[in-house]
Amino acid sequence: MYFVVRLLLVIVFIFSMGGAASSADAVEKAYEWLKSQQVPNSVVTYPVMKRRHLVLSFELNRDNPLNENDKSFQYVFSRSSLYDNALAIIAFVMMGDFKRASQIIESLYRNIDEKGFLWFTYNTHNNWPDETDTSWAISRNGASAWAGYAILFYIQAKLQNENLKIDRNNVLNDPELKDYLELCSLIADHILTWQIQDKKDNRYGLIIGGLNRLELVYDEDKNSVYEKFLEGPTPWVSVEHNIDTYFFLRDLAKIAQNKKYEDAATTLKEALLKKAWNHELSQFARGVREKEQDTALALDCASWGSLFALAVGDRDKAVKAYETSEKYKIVQDKEKNIYGYKPYLSGLVYEEQSDVNTYYFPRNPHVSWKDFDMIWPEGSLGVAFSALKLGDSKKVENILEAMKNFQAPSGGILYASRDVPYQFSTSPSVAGTAWFIMVAQSLKNENMRNLFWGED
């Protein structure tokens, strides 16, 4: 009953908000909301010093009974995702707010270790995780690559803003940018320790997930679901993460004039094109295993995959992946322009956990993403960026207009149109909001459009 009521509330909210603001007003509201997510703010008034200026990933209202009665709220209310901070850097830069972008970069400086290691998420009200407490902490190389790429984006945009050529000499002549380039190299060097070097391995050239993972487990005795923490390297290879990493290594190689990064990026590119593209699916696979592909259908591997293929000069794959992304489209109300894209097209909602699927969907324990209607604004905006790069500006405008239906009164864009415990939340999110800003600003600013994930 809870899920039905929550879903109805969200649908009522969406229907009541659609088309309330002009595009410019919607972007400005999103920007103001993003600024309000930086700590210190009204939620975390006294963040620990090393976490100052990070952004809170979600807008979680303490006064909302759904949060107040959630036992996990005390642990997640101050949570700041590395990926979200990377997006915030890019969004702030696209808004011309270099000060806030640099504040986040400085915070990352305070939290990286001497080997270039970054955690996937950070608390802001206390020091978890740090060298004294890494329990339940995970690290993802894809998120670290996003952080590195965002810093490089800042460097390049800052030089452009000062009418300077984007090259190594101009970076080294600026003390701030020189430090930031060194930070990027530190991050890249750590990521490359995870690149598969065995040429006999089907994953050769690709980068594995990272360190530690969480697994959902159904407790039959307590009739409940909980997360289990598993320590050690994460052996899977995410194609989406490797696409992120390619753009980071490629741009770092260009700016730093470093052949090590150039060779690593080239190897990664060739591995993605050879091992990750699926001709039958007409998109990139979700992952690559030791002997075969993980062929689950993921939206990012169609939309971001299209951006990657276009960047490396394979327009045929770019167009095919872009066209495939339309299969993920959901229209909830054509008359009111309520539509978007779902994150997956195949697999159980709780993949490979049939007992967990049964717990959450007792009437339909085999429910899969194919039949599960949920709009994902962040992913929908990824499709919009792919459309923008391929010259379909009308589609970009339409998606932006549709995403305004998911903008909360506070200005934040909902993470998803319905709750899926442990996976998707209906709370306003940095991810959705930052992507909204990035697409809108890139639509009107050709320099930003070309700078972000540009062509080789």
Predicted features by range, described:
Residues 1-3:
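N-terminal secretory signal peptides that target proteins for export/translocation
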Residues 22-71, 79-83, 110, 116-142, ...:
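Extended ligand-binding clefts on enzyme/binding-domain cores
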Residues 85-101, 108, 302-309, 386-390, ...:
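Alpha-helical support elements that line or immediately flank enzyme active sites
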Residues 375-380, 384-407:
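Surface-exposed substrate-engagement region within the catalytic domains
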